[in-house]
Amino acid sequence: MSRLQTRFDQLKEQNRAALVTFVTAGDPGYDTSLAILKGLPAAGADVIELGMPFTDPMADGPAIQLANIRALEAKQNLLKTLQMVREFRKGNNDTPLVLMGYFNPIHKYGVPKFIADAKEAGVDGLIVVDMPPEHNGELCDPAQAAGIDFIRLTTPTTDDVRLPTVLNGSSGFVYYVSVAGVTGAGAATLEHVEEAVARLRRHTDLPISIGFGIRTPEQAAAIARLADGVVVGSALIDHIANAKNDQQAIDGVLGLCAALSEGVRNASV
């Protein structure tokens, strides 16, 4: 059984959602990024998404775009990102770790070599935002054959006709991205999420995680009552962007992670 399935199964038994945290590898530099990565599980992260820096992250908002720039300026590349995973695994063999990004760096690295190296490093899953299911044979199928989950993104515009195609070959969990980020989890917004989760559950038995512009423990708790996972990225990355030094970046990210985790754990599912 994969680390992802094990973790979601454990949390289901505890009747709570997973806190899924996203940070960009190498932001603001390798050592600080690794310290953040190593600290996330103890701060309450149940699943970690680690961004693979890319020069043209077209599907990401301003905060993550800037994180990519900072990481690339610090000379982060895919080789170093996999090394970071290896370093993380030396002290943590339980927390699922998913690489998220775009196909171009993987293509340049070489798909067979990437899959072999990712598996050896301890990567559990991939989210590759510009690889539609029509191209499953290029990356999704060989990754899954090696035991690496391939996680699909769905959005409010993914209709019932398209959903089965998108979910075909998906594993690990489904990542639902609400394209309209929120500043406060209002009732209408939560109603929209509840409807989206119900619609997805008609099409898949996989856990459903929501990425939602979540910034506060209260928002995290509200989403945790509706879904299997709560994804937080930009709010964590903002602490790196606004930090005056590396230690402040580490403390800011891990402090917010702990607060979000408390919100998720206190939510009654």
Swiss-Prot record:
The record's InterPro entries line, in alphabetical order, gives: Aldolase_TIM, RibuloseP-bd_barrel, Trp_synthase_alpha_AS, Trp_synthase_suA
Gene Ontology terms, MF aspect? tryptophan synthase activity
Question: One GO CC term of this entry?
Answer: cytosol
Substrates-to-products reaction catalysed: (1S,2R)-1-C-(indol-3-yl)glycerol 3-phosphate + L-serine = D-glyceraldehyde 3-phosphate + L-tryptophan + H2O
Does the entry feature the keyword Phosphoprotein, yes or no?
no
Specify the superkingdom.
Bacteria
The catalytic site is made up of: 49, 60
Its EC number(s)? 4.2.1.20
Query: Keywords on this record?
Result: Amino-acid biosynthesis, Aromatic amino acid biosynthesis, Lyase, Tryptophan biosynthesis
Task: Identify the PROSITE patterns for this entry.
Answer: TRP_SYNTHASE_ALPHA
Q: Which NCBIfam families match?
A: trpA
Describe the subunit structure: Tetramer of two alpha and two beta chains.
Q: What does this protein do?
A: The alpha subunit is responsible for the aldol cleavage of indoleglycerol phosphate to indole and glyceraldehyde 3-phosphate.
Entry protein name: Tryptophan synthase alpha chain
Q: Can you name the source organism? A: Pseudomonas syringae pv. syringae
Q: Which gene encodes it?
A: trpA
